[in-house]
Amino acid sequence: MKTLFLFLQLFFFISSFTASGQQSFTGKIENATPDKPAMDIVLFMFGLDNPVKVGTVDEKGNISIDFPEVLPDTIAPETKEIFSTQLPYALFFSCPDITSVAEGTVVYKGGYFSLSHQNRPWAATLFPVSDIGIIPWLEDRYYQSPIMASFYEVIYCEQNIDLTTLCKESISYTENTIDMEYQYTLRLKKGFNLIEYKIEAIQETGIPDTSPIPSVVTITNADDMDAIRWHAKYYYSQFN
C-alpha cells in the first residue's frame, strides 16, 4: 500500500528575481579525442527538427555554455504547445500529488545536452554528472544499478517558480517496502534552469533481476559547476 506525506509550499512570482545557478559556464569533455571537430551544444527540447543551441565545444573538448535569455523565435507556437508541460512532469523525480499545486506552470523539459555537427545533426549525447559511474543507470534504469552521485538536466520555465517540497512515500514490493524521500529546494527563474538531482541513498527492491532504486534524492538548482564532469557518448566516428 502506498502512502504519501507531502509538505509543500509552491509560490509563483510575477516580478523577476535572481535564481541560484548560472547562465554561462564552462567545462571540458573528459573523454574528448583529437579526431572530433568543433560542434554546437544543443537541446532537442522541441524535437530533432528544432534544436536549441545553448553552447559550443571546440576540437579540444572545451565546453562553453551560454543559455539564451529567451527561446528562439523560430519555434512555432503550435510546436511549443505540443512540448509544453507542467513542472511535475518535467522533473526526473516527481511526487504524484503535486500536480494540482503546480497547476498553471508552463515549462519545457530540456533533458540532456547533445552535440550537433553540420554533417551529423545528432552526433553525441553529453552527460553532465558528478561520477561517470551513474551513466549506465541513466541510460537503462530497469537493468542497471544507480550509485550515490549527482546528474543534471535542463528545464525552461515560462514564469518564475519557487518550490520547496518534502515528499515522502512508501512503496510496497512483494518482499520489501521502500521508504522514499524527495527533497525539493528549487528557485527557478523564467528562462533556462540547470537542475541537480543528487542521489543520497539507494535501496534494493527485493525483486530478482530488478535494479535497486534511489530512495533519498535532493533536487536543487545547480550551483557548483566545477563539480560537473562532462562525458560524451559519440554516435559517429567520421564527420566529413
Explain the meaning of each model-derived region.
Residues 18-26, 236-240:
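Sec-dependent signal peptide cleavage junction
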Residues 52-55, 183-185:
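Beta-strand-rich interaction surfaces with strong enrichment in secreted/lumenal proteins
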Residues 22-40:
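Structural motif
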